[in-house]
Amino acid sequence: MTDVLAVIREMSSSFTPSEAKIAKYILENPTVVTELSVNELANACDTSEASIIRFCRTIGLKGFQELKIKIAVSLAKQTRKLDGGITSEDDVMAVIQKIANFNKQAIDSTIAVLNAEELTKAAEALANANKIDFYGVAASGVVAYDAMLKFSRINIPCTAYQDTHLQLTSAVNLKKGDVAFGISYSGATKEIVEAIQTAKEAGATTISLTKYGQSPLAKAADINLFVSSEEAMFRAGAMASRIAQLTVIDILFILVAQKKYNDVVRYLENTSEVLSMRKINN
């Protein structure tokens, strides 16, 4: 079941001013909202009942009653969060606990917003691709490289591009049967959006991996995969979002491996054997 509070959080940047006001109140007062009528919530948000209903439909719900039920479910499933981000006073154990907690929350929230149908479509496209180009910069570039390492081990032709000029020169030469996979947590990285648009115009199937919501990258791609994470103020290399993205790549890798199971077993045995020769024996 989708975590409606996570959905509202991730869609916040795409809401209209009226919707943003409703979202802010819900996120700040989720327990209170479960006890309000639609009229009471409208008054609390200084808006109309019709606006509340439109908001519900914007986030994929049928109406206000469903919103209240899903908020109650989200609250029931919430685990206690460690208070605040990392501070200069935190000892080693506090840092260990907080990082583990941030990453766990990112994975749990991502599982809540992942769409099985879109995952299936993405896995099908990747399994049948003539070649795959992964595009990402900075922390998302690390995820693109990880994806290339995984899929190359099962004999799927793929390349990870972090250089923005190479992304464009790759994208423009793709064709039908190829896949371009753009990775950007914000979904607004100009170079990644341009590369995906270029690949799509060239005839390739395009996939995006970005935070939940209608970002420029999500609008440009054929297939959208979403992650969810709340980054702490003190962060190193977009930690939580990177973990969420890597989790989706792992899921896709297994889904593709299932589709090519007999071949994959042989490929993994081959790669394991050849790499074992590079290890130093004690």
From Swiss-Prot:
Residues 2-78 form the HTH rpiR-type domain. GO terms for biological process: carbohydrate derivative metabolic process. Coiled coil: none annotated. Keywords: DNA-binding, Transcription, Transcription regulation. It holds the Pfam family SIS. InterPro entries: Homeodomain-like_sf (IPR009057), HTH_RpiR (IPR000281), RpiR-like (IPR047640), RpiR-like_SIS (IPR035472), SIS_dom (IPR001347), SIS_dom_sf (IPR046348), WH-like_DNA-bd_sf (IPR036388). Transmembrane segments: none annotated. Residues 122-262 form the SIS domain. Residues 38-57 bind DNA. GO terms for molecular function: carbohydrate derivative binding; DNA binding; DNA-binding transcription factor activity. This is Uncharacterized HTH-type transcriptional regulator TTE0211. It comes from Caldanaerobacter subterraneus subsp. tengcongensis (strain DSM 15242 / JCM 11007 / NBRC 100824 / MB4) (Thermoanaerobacter tengcongensis).
